[in-house]
Regions:
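SF2 helicase catalytic motif II
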Residues: 105-152
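Non-catalytic terminal extensions of ATP-dependent helicases
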Residues: 277, 367-531
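Conserved segment of the helicase C-terminal RecA-like domain
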Residues: 148-150, 295, 299-355
Length: 531
């Protein structure tokens, strides 16, 4: 039975067509952001029947996502439907034996790949096109998946989707159906007129690519506005209090949220919740906003289109993914996309308006999947250098040059050798290299892995907070270092572990309790609305 207050969504013609095309088969579903792909996935997995009522899945259903926030969101959505659903990420799990499970791709690859009698939905599959280390995790998990397990890959639109279908068929040795749609539930309008002043920004998500830019633009936009009415400010502070946010950022009191990777989870939840309650009407953020987080807005405004990281304009695919956040059925029947004129936050030597005009004319780029070598497997001697290079070359899209991959692997292994000489004494190097292979964690860079391996080599069972101190300089904040060590601890092989994990968990709870209690806090926020 549906939970009280939950109404089954209505289907659109393209969704019914997709369900028919994908019925009983593995498939790739490519459709724009905000088009309603999730409804198709629920039907495909038998979580909904044709009338939109709860279905009866014949197998366990697993949903994977590239980031924890999306697993949390999918879990909460399925809970609202009244389903028995669990969640498992590297640092949190709840009801993980449930018939429906939401997890990160890393957890699927580590724990669930190879199991039978499941249906697998891979959400935001396009994420792997721009992240080689994560692409390897995705493809390792998919290659380990039992051939009888049905797969549904959900993705935003991209160029030459048929190449991805053929790639998956070649790598996974099974047939796939490709269903592409350009349909959107709401109309998307690309404006020819820019926004010229922060005072003109309303009902919008504003994109930039740096924390400093986000903070500056949020402040400037807030300064152009009156403070919110007292009752709205009180409500924002009440939400913040429930989430444990002691000081509400000044821009929120004028209806402007800010969103970037250095925020604590509770700070992100405050912005997301206040925006969905329409207490805020603007969120200024990095492209973290584009990763499926549910923030319905009428406008998407680009205040930057050339990233500092690449020192180049963003891709058409990335542009469309962010633009697709505009519009939401039932709130904004049309979504509008534009740019901020003469943006002072644009990468120097670039003009936002010129890039915007060029992106509108540019075709979508073909999907590219570049796999990274598995140095853990190489160090454990589970494969030869040649076999690993051949796998990486053949299973990338387009295929990489074999000798180029060989040179890349040899270069990294030489670096391992030279760094080992600096990190440990000669009599420990064989032991150290063995440990490095055994505790290697794909989430971490080479030097981070080597420092952690040294800790195990010298201390046997090191204290978790000692490992946190090693990683902290590489992370945006201490919480991220704490959570990474928690995920590493969960992934360590038998015979390895950290002392003081209870101390680490206690510190995580003191820094941000919503890591473990997000569902309870959100329920409390919802209940507090009725008073």
């Amino acid at each position: 039975v549906w939970r009280e207050g939950y109404a089954p969504p209505l289907a659109y013609p393209w969704q019914e067509e997709a369900v028919e095309a994908l019925r009983g088969r593995s498939g790739v579903l490519a459709a724009p952001t905000g088009s309603g792909k999730t409804w198709v996935a629920y039907r495909w997995a038998h979580l909904l029947d044709a009338s939109g009522m709860p279905g009866h899945p014949r197998e366990r259903v697993i949903f994977t996502a590239p980031i924890k926030a999306l697993s949390n969101e999918r879990y909460l959505d399925l809970r609202k439907m009244g389903l028995d659903v669990g969640i498992e990420t590297g640092d949190f799990k709840k009801n993980a034996d449930a018939p429906v499970l939401c997890c990160t791709q890393e957890i699927y690859t580590l724990k669930y790949a190879g199991r039978r009698n499941i249906r697998l939905v891979v959400d935001e599959f396009h994420y792997i096109f721009t992240d080689p280390p994560r692409a390897r995790t995705y493809m390792d998990g998919l290659r380990l998946t039992d051939p009888e397990v049905p797969l549904l890959m959900m993705s935003a639109t991209f160029g030459e989707a048929s190449r991805v279908k053929l790639y998956l068929e070649r790598v996974l040795q099974r047939p796939f159906v490709l269903f592409e749609s350009e349909a959107r539930i709401t109309e998307l309008v690309f404006s020819k007129e820019p926004v010229s002043h922060p005072a003109d920004i309303r009902n919008a998500l504003v994109f930039l690519f740096s924390r400093q830019g986000v903070e500056e633009m949020a402040e400037q936009t807030a300064l152009c506005r009156e403070r919110l009415p007292r009752e709205k400010i009180d409500r924002i502070r009440s939400i913040g209090s429930i989430l444990g946010v002691k000081k509400v950022p000044h821009p929120l009191l004028s209806g402007v949220g800010l969103y970037h990777g250095s925020l604590l989870p509770r700070e992100k939840l405050l912005v997301e919740t206040a925006f969905r309650e329409r207490l805020l009407d603007v969120v200024v953020g990095t492209d973290a906003l584009a990763l499926g987080v549910n923030l319905p807005a009428e406008y998407v405004i680009f205040a930057q289109l050339a990233s500092y990281h690449d020192d180049a304009p963003i891709s058409k695919n990335h542009f469309l993914q962010m633009a697709g956040r505009a519009g939401r059925k039932g709130l904004y029947e049309k979504g509008y996309v534009t740019w901020f004129d003469r943006s002072p936050w644009e990468n120097r030597f670039y003009d936002t308006g010129e890039i915007y005009a060029g992106l509108l004319k540019k075709p979508s780029e073909p999907a590219a999947i570049e796999l990274s070598p598995s140095y853990g497997r190489l160090l454990r001697e589970e494969c030869t250098l040649e076999a690993e290079a051949r796998m990486v070359a053949q299973y990338s899209l387009p295929e990489r040059d074999y000798w180029e991959v060989v040179r890349e692997i040899r270069s990294v292994l030489r670096k391992v050798g030279s760094l080992s000489k600096r990190l440990v004494k000669p009599h420990l190097r064989k032991k150290y290299r063995d440990i490095l292979g055994e505790v290697w964690f794909d989430e971490m860079e080479l030097e981070q892995n080597m420092k952690i391996a040294r800790l195990f080599c010298l201390q046997g069972m090191p204290h978790a907070l000692s490992a946190v101190r090693l990683l902290e300089p590489h992370e945006r904040n201490r919480l991220q270092a704490l959570l990474r060590i928690k995920r590493l601890a969960n992934a360590l092989p038998r015979g390895y572990g950290f002392k003081g994990m209870s101390v680490l968990e206690k510190e995580i709870h003191s820094v941000d309790a919503t890591v473990f209690t997000f569902e309870e806090r959100l329920r409390e926020i919802e209940e507090s609305r009725s008073f």
